[in-house]
């Protein structure tokens, strides 16, 4: 009975609980319904208020083409309650002029895309025309309703001024992906100047007056891909100015006044692929500056103040393909400066002060296809310097630009001839053709056949030398006579050509002794009492020409010819005409010389002096006749045989070949052992 009583009590308690639940649930449901009803009413009120405000704003959200009707000033001030319903927090007067309205009296005028009524603006280019556009100017309130704006550009016009970044105006534009400010007077980019813009991908602040970047000036833009600060006056950047920019790919800092780069400045830009630091005042580079830039493809350092590139400066730039170091003051590059640049394809060292390229410099650049060393002070290029990339030069579409240096014509350049013959690409051949060098003590045997007329002029072949008393002599080369006929050539004409045409041929580099002209004239007039005509037929009969080291010998009583060399028939154009025994020789040629250098002593001036040199194209010389000097003691600078050009330049290929041979030998041994074991079992 007790058990039945207990069961009955439990049943009654459960019944009471169920009844209570049924009574409470409708009450709570009604309460929730009441709250939903009040919520809908509240929302309806807000929407009504917003709608009213929107009507009063005269298409503030949409683009417009005219100002508010009935308002001469174009401004309508709304109540602060309407503004407070937004997210700007602004509680002052509003400018209700259509966002894309354009009038001459406006401080700021925007060109919109699309520029249609009742269509949300996606892109706007705004021109500033006023010097008095302050941060609290009501003109800025026109931006508060442009929630869908994605691209915004400010261009400050002449006689206008904007010396701040309108952070308060930009911040509410949450959909903004691109912001551009050009030609402003902004001097400092302050911390978080573009904060709270989650979709921002591009910031361009070029052609402004920016001088400094504060800490966190561009921090925490996790979607930013391009930052352009070119053509400013930046000289100081905080170490953490670019903090937390994980997706940034392109950074432009060129055309500023940057002299120092903090270590780790770009450490938070791991995705950076393009970095332009050209046209600055940078004078020192360290490996820590480029720490973390393993994805960088292009590094431009053109026109800075660099004079030395140290070891492993670019060691962490594993993906670098283009390195621009032109227009600096680089005197030396360390042998290991380019170590680790396995993907480098373009190296520009044009217009520096390099006198030598270390043999091991290109050892770490096996993929290099283009190297420019124009306009330096290089005296030679050795085979061993370019051996690591020789396969590329011969077999790939490669470029080697070497013009405008101070190369010496000697045996160290012999390998250039073989490279020109073996490369498959016309562009490389053409660039090598432009290689000029200085040949000391030129001889006719140095030159290829047929010898160009300009070279003969330089060597005084077919030229003339007028001999005067007191060991005074005058030499002339090339273009010594005007016209093709020698008929009627007088002594006055000869003296005239000696004094003027020769100097023109030598481009002003040759100067006559002060007394030589008068002495020659007097001597020639005394020795010749009458004029003689030289016939064209007489000229044609004189051959071959001679190479002359002309000098005046008082003991012999006249001119002597030394070291005469006969020339080929192909040079018959160079004739000689004689005025008689002991008379000056006059040669005829219509081509100016390239370049010559001379030295003289006393009143005597000879066309070929003890030390003379010419600046000439390398490929006008015979490679086997290039002089070798005793001072070339470095074995890596000695000439190479043709066979050495066949040696593969890529050390890795040599190692792989050796490895393959070793593997083949090992496999042979293993096969032999297996065969012996099978035979023994049999």
Swiss-Prot record:
Subcellular location: Cell membrane
Positions of the UniProt region annotated as Disordered: 29-54, 503-536
Tissue expr: Predominantly expressed in abdominal and thoracic segment muscle and motorneuron cells.
Prodomain positions: 659-682
Topological category with respect to the lipid bilayer: Lipid-anchor; GPI-anchor
Gene Ontology CC entries for this record: axonal growth cone; cell surface; neuromuscular junction; plasma membrane; side of membrane
Signal peptide: 1-24
Low complexity compositional bias, start-end: 40-54
InterPro entries given in the database record: Cys-rich_flank_reg_C, Leu-rich_rpt, Leu-rich_rpt_typical-subtyp, LRR_dom_sf
Lipid moiety-binding residues (GPI-anchor amidated alanine): 658
Stretches assigned to the LRRCT domain: 405-462
Function, as annotated: Cell adhesion protein involved in target recognition during neuromuscular development. Mediates homophilic cellular adhesion.
Protein name per Swiss-Prot or TrEMBL: Connectin
Organism: Drosophila melanogaster (Fruit fly)
């Amino acid at each position: 009975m007790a058990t039945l009583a207990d069961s009955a009590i439990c049943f009654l308690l459960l019944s009471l609980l169920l009844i209570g639940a049924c009574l409470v649930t409708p009450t709570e449901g009604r309460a929730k319904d009441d709250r939903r009803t009040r919520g809908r009413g509240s929302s309806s009120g807000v929407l009504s208020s917003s709608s009213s405000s929107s009507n009063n704003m005269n298409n503030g959200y949409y683009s417009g083409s005219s100002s508010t009707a009935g308002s001469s000033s174009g401004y309508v001030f709304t109540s602060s309650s309407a503004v407070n319903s937004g997210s700007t927090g602004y509680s002052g007067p509003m400018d209700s002029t259509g966002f894309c309205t354009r009038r001459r009296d406006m401080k700021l005028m925007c060109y919109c895309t699309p520029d249609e009524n009742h269509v949300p603006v996606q892109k706007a280019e705004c021109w500033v025309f006023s010097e008095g556009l302050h941060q609290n100017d009501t003109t800025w309130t026109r931006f508060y309703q442009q929630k869908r704006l994605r691209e915004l550009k400010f261009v400050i016009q002449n006689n206008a001024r904007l010396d701040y970044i309108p952070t308060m105006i930009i911040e509410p534009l949450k959909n903004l992906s691109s912001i551009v400010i050009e030609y402003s007077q902004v001097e400092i980019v302050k911390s978080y100047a573009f904060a709270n813009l989650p979709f921002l991908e591009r910031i361009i602040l070029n052609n402004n007056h920016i001088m400094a970047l504060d800490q966190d000036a561009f921090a925490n833009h996790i979607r930013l891909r391009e930052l352009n600060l070119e053509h400013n006056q930046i000289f100081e950047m905080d170490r953490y100015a670019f903090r937390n920019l994980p997706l940034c790919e392109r950074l432009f800092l060129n055309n500023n006044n940057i002299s120092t780069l903090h270590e780790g400045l770009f450490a938070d830009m791991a995705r950076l692929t393009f970095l332009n630091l050209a046209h600055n005042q940078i004078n020192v580079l360290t490996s820590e500056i480029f720490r973390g830039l393993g994805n960088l493809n292009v590094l431009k350092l053109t026109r800075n103040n660099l004079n030395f590139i140290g070891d492993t400066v670019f060691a962490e730039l594993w993906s670098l393909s283009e390195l621009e170091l032109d227009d600096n003051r680089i005197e030396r590059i360390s042998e290991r400066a380019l170590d680790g640049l396995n993907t480098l394809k373009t190296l520009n060292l044009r217009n520096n002060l390099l006198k030598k390229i270390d043999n091991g410099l290109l050892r770490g650049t096996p993929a290099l296809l283009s190297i420019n060393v124009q306009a330096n002070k290089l005296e030679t290029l050795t085979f061993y310097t370019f051996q690591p990339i020789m396969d590329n030069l011969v077999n790939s579409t490669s470029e080697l630009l070497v013009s405008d240096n101070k190369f010496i014509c000697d045996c160290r350049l012999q390998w250039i001839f073989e490279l020109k013959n073996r490369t498959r690409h016309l562009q490389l051949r053409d660039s090598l053709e432009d290689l000029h060098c200085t040949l000391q003590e030129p001889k006719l045997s140095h030159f290829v056949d047929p010898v160009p007329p300009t070279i003969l002029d330089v060597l005084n072949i077919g030229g003339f030398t007028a001999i005067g008393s007191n060991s005074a002599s005058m030499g002339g080369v090339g273009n010594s006579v005007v016209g093709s006929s020698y008929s009627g050539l007088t002594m006055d004409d000869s003296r005239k050509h000696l004094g003027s045409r020769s100097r023109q041929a030598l481009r002003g580099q040759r100067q006559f002794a002060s007394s030589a002209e008068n002495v020659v004239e007097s001597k020639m007039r005394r020795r010749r009492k009458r004029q003689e005509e030289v016939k064209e037929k007489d000229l044609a009969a004189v051959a071959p020409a001679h190479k002359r080291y002309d000098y005046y010998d008082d003991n012999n009583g006249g001119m002597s010819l030394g070291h005469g060399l006969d020339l080929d028939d192909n040079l018959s154009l160079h004739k000689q005409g004689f005025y008689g025994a002991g008379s000056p020789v006059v040669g005829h040629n219509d081509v100016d010389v390239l370049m010559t250098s001379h030295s003289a002593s006393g009143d005597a001036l000879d066309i070929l002096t003890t030390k003379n040199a010419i600046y000439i194209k390398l490929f006008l010389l015979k490679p086997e006749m290039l002089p070798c000097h005793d001072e070339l003691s470095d074995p890596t600078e000695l000439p190479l045989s043709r066979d050495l050009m066949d040696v593969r330049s890529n050390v890795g290929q040599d190692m792989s070949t050796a490895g393959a041979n070793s593997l083949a030998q090992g496999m042979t041994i293993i096969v032999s052992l297996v065969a012996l074991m099978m035979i023994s079992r049999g």
